Amino acid sequence: MSIKISSLKEKMKQALTSTKKVISEDFVNKNEKKINTNDKLPETLTIDDLSSPQDFIRLRAEFDSSALEKKFSDKKIFKNNLPKNLSYKTLYTLAEKTRYELLGCQMLKGIEKNLNQNYYQIMNIKKEQKLNTKEDVMVSEAFELYLLKNFQKIKLNSISEKKLSFWENDFDKSIK
């Protein structure tokens, strides 16, 4: 890898890490001796994985989401209320993620733009599948689409709408 690309990736890492610290308000006061060891990159993507604009969009969204989780989510409360059932855990985790991302989107429009771009990108990657019944769609995927549509006001594409259509009435009855 050339020195120029390596330098650019290091600057990008610094910028994203600094942005994450500011959003999450996780910076060390000069008078404090505390050293922050939680300054890690989101684990699903690293700077070295960047090879396209889509990767950069995903990385920005992951950093923003990670920062918002740190700012707005209390791990102790989250764990105390975490359901035992695996399916319920997944739905609970999705609802919590939507909650803190929604708070962040209300706080900063740049975060909203980054997250929305990433969700649109994810939806557009998914291919048309054979969807005939509710059993063809995982409840967690449908629930995430429901949360995106109804709380984050993201316009779903036709494939996502079809996936959600099998579950939407059930979610409406349970939530509204």
Please provide the spans of the model-predicted regions.
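Basic/hydrophobic alpha-helical interface regions
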Residues: 1-176
